[in-house]
């Protein structure tokens, strides 16, 4: 770290540099370049958040770490490596885990965290295609407490159009999130963070798909979705799961009007929306069926294989549920996201019990 240069937690970085429309959803506050391709990145996690709220034991929501990793890569790409604004970021894989959750307790002030980041180029063919990967160690108060990684490619409009056509969809016009106006022109969409899949994006041809249920025509948004408490959320609108047509299957409930999951218009299902679906299904599986205490997400590894469209049902299928090998051990889950028979994404998750927190009965206040 350069002499005399300390990380600042005073204000968020410009929102367009992390592909967010709302300033309130920007967690990264600063970055300092070190030797080689190494950085220290500062972020501030809120004491509370409508979607990413503390768990029953008072620790910060695990997906705050995932979103901070995403924002970190996008910010470094634009600010330090010259990836042009307006390029489409396509997610390949993400993983994260926690090694010491005690330091993640939410206190009387927002939680300052630091990511020790290493950057590497991968599958890199600039200037049309930038392939990049970051590895990050999460620290709080100087204590390492987690690690994670993210790999993406960023492509120009021509190559993005080719990727979309391979997926059977034309690329819709999606200008970058503006640093000036928080509202896109009528009929236009703004790029979200990182789409899932080896090439993933939009739902409708040439524009933004209207908010509809992933369950198909004839259903309103929210119809039949699981109660928020059953999936570990506080608000009804934050539940993204509906029972599927067969045992072990659930439908992803998409509400494009959700102010956090769909921070701005998009033409595909974003990675963070899929991750939220995986997380909620994991909570449901580990906290019901006789569990003595609720569980929290201790780690996840997500592989992105194909674009998830907005106007076709996305089904989440539980393919593995492995009980702890010993008392206090993690529950291991594997989930697949499927659309029209195409495997979109897979997630392997590790869940650990929240000590001293009893499970509430489904539907109780």
Task: List the predicted regions and their residue ranges.
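Non-catalytic linker/capping segments at the edges of enzyme domains
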Residues: 1-57, 153-265, 362-365
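Hydrophobic residues on conserved beta-strands that form the core of alpha/beta folds
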Residues: 28-29, 91-93, 147, 297-299, ...
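Active-site helix/loop of acyl-thioester processing domains in fatty-acid/polyketide metabolism
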Residues: 60-86, 269-292
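Acidic/His-leaning functional-site neighborhoods
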Residues: 239-306, 310-313, 334-336
């Amino acid at each position: 770290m350069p002499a005399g240069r300390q990380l600042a937690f005073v204000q968020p970085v410009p929102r367009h540099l992390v592909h967010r429309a709302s300033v309130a959803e920007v967690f990264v506050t600063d970055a300092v370049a070190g030797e080689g391709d190494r950085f220290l990145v500062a972020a501030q996690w809120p004491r509370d958040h409508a979607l990413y709220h503390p768990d029953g034991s008072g620790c910060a929501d695990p997906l705050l770490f995932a979103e901070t990793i995403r924002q970190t890569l996008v910010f470094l790409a634009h600010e330090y490596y010259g990836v042009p604004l307006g390029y489409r970021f396509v997610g390949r894989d993400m993983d994260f885990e926690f090694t010491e959750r005690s330091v993640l307790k939410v206190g009387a002030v927002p939680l300052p965290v630091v990511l020790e980041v290493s950057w590497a180029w991968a599958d890199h063919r600039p200037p049309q295609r930038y392939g990049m990967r970051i590895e990050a160690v999460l620290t709080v108060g100087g204590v390492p407490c987690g690690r994670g990684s993210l790999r993406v490619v960023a492509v120009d409009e021509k190559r993005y159009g080719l990727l979309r056509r391979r997926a059977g969809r034309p690329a819709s016009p999606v200008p970058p999130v503006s640093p000036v106006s928080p509202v896109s022109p009528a009929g236009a969409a703004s790029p979200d963070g990182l789409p899932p899949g080896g090439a993933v994006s939009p739902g409708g041809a040439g524009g933004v798909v209207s908010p509809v249920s992933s369950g198909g025509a004839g259903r309103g948004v929210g119809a039949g979705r699981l109660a928020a408490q059953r999936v570990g959320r506080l608000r009804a609108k934050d539940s993204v799961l509906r029972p599927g047509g067969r045992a072990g299957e659930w439908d992803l409930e998409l509400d494009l009007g959700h102010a956090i999951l769909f921070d701005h218009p998009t033409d595909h299902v974003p990675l963070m929306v899929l991750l939220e679906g995986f997380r909620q299904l994991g909570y449901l599986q580990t906290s019901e069926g006789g569990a003595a205490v609720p569980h929290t997400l201790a780690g996840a590894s997500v592989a992105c294989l194909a674009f998830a469209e907005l106007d076709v049902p996305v089904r989440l299928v539980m393919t593995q549920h492995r009980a702890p090998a010993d008392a206090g051990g993690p529950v291991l889950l594997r989930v697949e996201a499927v659309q029209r028979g195409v495997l979109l994404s897979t997630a392997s998750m590790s869940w650990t019990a929240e000590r001293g927190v009893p499970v509430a009965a489904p539907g109780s206040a």
